[in-house]
Design a protein with these regions (language model features):
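Positively charged n-region of N-terminal signal peptides that target proteins for export
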Residues: 1-4
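Bacterial N-terminal signal peptides
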Residues: 8-20
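Electrostatic cytochrome c docking/interface patches
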Residues: 20-36
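Gly/Gly-Pro-rich "capping" loops immediately C-terminal to redox-active cysteine motifs
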Residues: 32-34, 48-78
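The canonical Cys-X-X-Cys-His
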Residues: 33, 38-47, 101
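Axial heme c-ligation environment in periplasmic c-type cytochrome domains
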Residues: 55-63, 76-108
């Protein structure tokens, strides 16, 4: 194999790591998102991997990715969600909180 090809293959192998969080940062973000979900959302939504939502109209968080692209919720979370399910109060999160909540939602997809 030529040196240029080896260099290109090595660069491609490292590329995904440039755009992802280190595992400990991801875990911390997921934990923060879980805390936000339990504090702000668990009265109506099932926020864990199991169980029904206390409010029937509120979808379980583990199923949200089947309804919406979870990555697209960042703007709605930052601007304030006003229309979710019937009776849903308005929530507004700062960008870091929105990112943490999205990380938690994505962790439920696995």
């Amino acid at each position: 194999m030529r040196p240029a090809a080896i260099l290109a293959a090595g660069a491609l192998a490292l590329l995904p790591g440039l755009f992802s969080l280190p595992a400990h940062a991801w875990d911390r973000q997921v934990k923060q998102g879980e805390t936000l979900a339990r504090t702000n959302c668990a009265r109506c939504h099932a926020v864990g991997r199991l169980g029904a939502s206390p409010l029937r109209a509120a979808p379980p968080f583990r199923e949200l990715h089947t309804r919406y692209p979870v990555e697209d919720l960042g703007e709605a979370l930052a601007e304030g969600i006003r229309t979710g399910h019937p009776g849903m109060p308005e929530f507004r999160f700062d960008p870091d909180q929105a990112e943490a909540l999205i990380a938690y939602l994505k962790s439920l997809e696995r």
